[in-house]
Amino acid sequence: MTPVQRRRLVWVLLALLASGLATALVAMALERNIAYLYTPSEVLRGDVDAQSRFRLGGMVVKGSFNRPVGSLEARFEVTDGDAQLAVTTSRILPDMFAEGTAVVASGRLQDGIFVADEVLAKHDEKYVPKEVADKMGDAHRKHDVPVTAPEVR
């Protein structure tokens, strides 16, 4: 092998090594920042790493919303039809937030309570987020509840 060929081979190997390292770093960063959607049943069953950040999806249980006067601290429960999980947040809730509506909350589990740092609510009476509709559909089929097809956007 001539010196020119050897030098080219070294550069090619260095380029491959650098691109492999960059790919691995990007994959690790994305994995740390990804937040999977779970239902209350999956959380209570232990399908979620207690230390990880994730999204909780379901319906706000009617009669569960509580916010002390003059406080941003809100407490409510989310259900998927099988189980209920208490949620607390100190953030401003969206205008469309209401009991009996679909929500997706992002946060962490602490002492059996989901502490949300973001709460998203549906934006009209027909809309349910696709991931929530799919997971709620499983609970509906399990309990023989007729499933109405939500408008998915």
Swiss-Prot record:
Heme chaperone required for the biogenesis of c-type cytochromes. Transiently binds heme delivered by CcmC and transfers the heme to apo-cytochromes in a process facilitated by CcmF and CcmH. Belongs to the CcmE/CycJ family. The gene is ccmE. It is a single-pass type II membrane protein. Heme binds at H123, Y127. Signal peptide: none annotated. Keywords: Cell inner membrane, Cell membrane, Cytochrome c-type biogenesis, Heme, Iron, Membrane, Metal-binding, Signal-anchor, Transmembrane, Transmembrane helix. HAMAP family: CcmE (MF_01959). Its main location: membrane. Residues 30-153 are periplasmic. It is found in: Cell inner membrane. This is Cytochrome c-type biogenesis protein CcmE.
